[in-house]
């Protein structure tokens, strides 16, 4: 089923970047900004709050713009926000990250809900159960791959001391930029959707 294949692939591709953020940002705040684990945890807390808030808007957004346009534009926004996490220098206030994380949580929620629902939209009744299981497994794999990918990129930049000018914080900044760009590029996967895809869900 085409929508299932594209949904699974898009889910995996976009989560590579998205899943790296909850690890990289607290790590950067602790290492580069010399803050406690508690402080770094509170910095990313708004992501969960806005994610819950976004749930009430997902259906309205999908009904108005459709799945294809929503996922492509939303992925671009998420990637741009991840890139923005690399803007502040080491002398900036850590509270600069709060509005970015809050907005990111909102769009993440839209992304996850849209990807999960379109993935099983065209499955037949006897395929729905196994389809849901595969979507769930794919999510777990994507989270693991995303964390690993983020750490690999960070390690690469940390080993390039001339590139980061012997400043660990610059390694994090370049990592966020790389992860953000990857996320933006992953949005092209959703071009394989048709404008009419998900119409059966939108009418409900």
Predicted segments — roles?
Residues 1-158, 167-197:
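12-transmembrane solute porter fold
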């Amino acid at each position: 089923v085409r929508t299932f294949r594209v949904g699974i692939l898009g889910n995996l591709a976009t989560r590579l970047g998205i899943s790296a953020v909850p690890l990289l940002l607290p790590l950067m705040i602790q290492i580069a900004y010399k803050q406690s684990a508690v402080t770094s945890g509170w910095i990313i807390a708004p992501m969960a709050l806005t994610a819950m808030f976004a749930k009430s808007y997902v259906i309205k957004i999908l009904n108005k713009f459709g799945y294809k346009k929503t996922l492509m534009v939303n992925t671009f926004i998420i990637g741009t926000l991840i890139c923005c996490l690399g803007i502040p220098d080491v002398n900036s206030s850590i509270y600069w990250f709060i509005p970015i994380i809050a907005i990111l949580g909102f769009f993440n929620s839209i992304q996850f809900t849209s990807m999960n629902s379109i993935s099983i939209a065209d499955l037949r009744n006897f395929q729905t159960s196994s389809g849901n299981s595969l979507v769930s497994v794919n999510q777990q794999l994507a989270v693991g791959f995303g964390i690993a990918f983020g750490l690999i990129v960070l390690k690469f930049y940390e080993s390039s001391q001339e590139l980061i000018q012997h400043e660990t914080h610059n390694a994090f900044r370049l990592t966020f930029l790389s992860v953000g760009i990857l996320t933006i590029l992953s949005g092209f996967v959703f071009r394989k959707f048709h404008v009419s895809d998900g119409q059966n869900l939108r009418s409900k």
